[in-house]
Design a protein with these regions (language model features):
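Short, conserved phosphate/pyrophosphate- and ester-handling motifs at nucleotide-, phospho-/glycolipid
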Residues: 14, 143, 252
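Terminal RNA-binding accessory module
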Residues: 1-54
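Extended interfacial segments that mediate partner engagement and assembly in macromolecular machines
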Residues: 34-167
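Short, acidic/hydrophobic/Gly-rich beta-strand patch recurrent on exposed beta strands
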Residues: 1-2, 125-128, 309
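Rossmann-like S-adenosyl-L-methionine
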Residues: 189-321
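Hydrophobic beta-strand signal
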Residues: 18-20, 110, 276
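Short, solvent-exposed loop/turn elements at beta->coil junctions and helix N-caps
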Residues: 95-102, 169-173, 214-220
Length: 321
């Protein structure tokens, strides 16, 4: 507009739109779509009822209005543009993109908990876009189906607790077999009655209940037998990686399988090969690489992750690698 670039939230290439201005800078403006006069061929109807770009819309994802294959193409373009604008680098060749499921692929999330009297009580969900407010969401087509189905019942559970004002977050993690853990961040110790309700919820929904009174390393299961119950599978390599619900893992297990397989295939490791994996974490690459190489060295700064990676190597018969 008038020779100035305008970035418009919610608009797609080739569309004619009417937008509202959000802010103006010397070299560009920011705006948000208010109506669409001519739609792009890649625009689709969002599946989520609270997806959008206006006030109150969910900040959990940003591309449901774009056809799934076009989303991948767009992300690829963003990567190439960033490499050039920041690093002045252009790839000599590009691998074909990896595609995965469009819906219910997110196996981990941090959900904010807020008791909001103006909205009728407890909310459990993602933040609204560009806001500290919690979105009034009752389902989520991105989270795994079982977790999406828990969102409204979780509101009822938290509402019934004496410490509902002292429980700011619920972290959710789902294993490759569907096993689910709920980590309740608590700023005050739950009462005996609170614990009974939490455990009853876990039994009803088939979820392991964890408490986190302080930082991530303080997270612990109410039942110690569930300490390493969650796991993800890499069947091509015969590897299972156990993890705590607060550990870093890829949110999309299906894509992770393909990514690990492709990376190791590209490495083309000889049988006598030696490999170093920096920032190895739980061993997402280290352990499957160990099934191909003669020796692997995993380097990681977190003592807890190192300990769990060692146990993972032993459990998968790779301790000597």
């Amino acid at each position: 507009r008038d020779g100035k670039v305008v970035f418009i939230q919610g608009a797609l290439p080739g569309e004619d739109v009417i937008y509202e201005e959000l802010r103006s800078k010397s070299s560009y403006d920011m705006g948000r779509v208010s109506s669409i006069l001519k739609e792009s061929v890649i625009r689709v109807k969002p599946r989520c009822p609270v997806f959008g770009f206006g006030p109150g819309s969910c900040g959990g994802c940003a591309m449901q209005h774009i056809e799934p294959l076009a989303q991948v193409a767009y992300k690829e373009k963003v990567l190439l543009d960033t490499l050039w604008h920041i690093g002045k680098v252009r790839p000599e060749s590009m691998l074909s993109p990896i595609y995965g499921p469009t819906w219910h692929y997110r196996h981990r999330a941090r959900l904010t908990v807020r008791d909001v009297a103006k909205k009728g009580g407890v909310l459990v969900g993602f933040h609204e876009k560009a806001s500290s407010y919690v979105c009034d969401m009752r389902e989520c087509p991105i989270l795994t189906k079982n977790v999406s189905d828990m969102l409204v019942p979780l509101r009822g559970l938290v509402s019934s607790l004496s410490i509902r004002q002292r429980m700011p977050q619920i972290e959710v993690a789902v294993g490759g077999d569907g096993r689910t853990a709920l980590v309740f961040r608590t700023l005050e110790e739950p009462s005996g009655e609170d614990m009974e309700r939490l455990l009853a919820f876990g039994r009803e929904w088939g979820a392991d209940i964890w408490l986190q009174p302080k930082g991530p390393e303080s997270a612990h299961p109410v039942d110690p037998a569930n300490e390493e119950a969650l796991g993800l599978e890499l069947p091509e390599f015969g590897v299972r990686i156990s993890f705590k619900p607060t550990d870093f893992t890829q949110v999309n297990h299906e894509l992770n399988e393909v990514m690990v397989s492709r990376a190791i295939r590209l490495l083309d490791i000889p049988k006598d090969g030696k490999v170093a994996d920096f920032f190895c974490g739980l061993g997402n690459f280290t352990l499957p690489i160990a099934t191909r190489a003669s020796r692997v060295i995993g380097i990681e700064g977190s003592e807890g992750l190192v300990a769990r990676a060692r146990r993972g190597a032993e459990a998968n018969g790779l301790k000597e690698k």
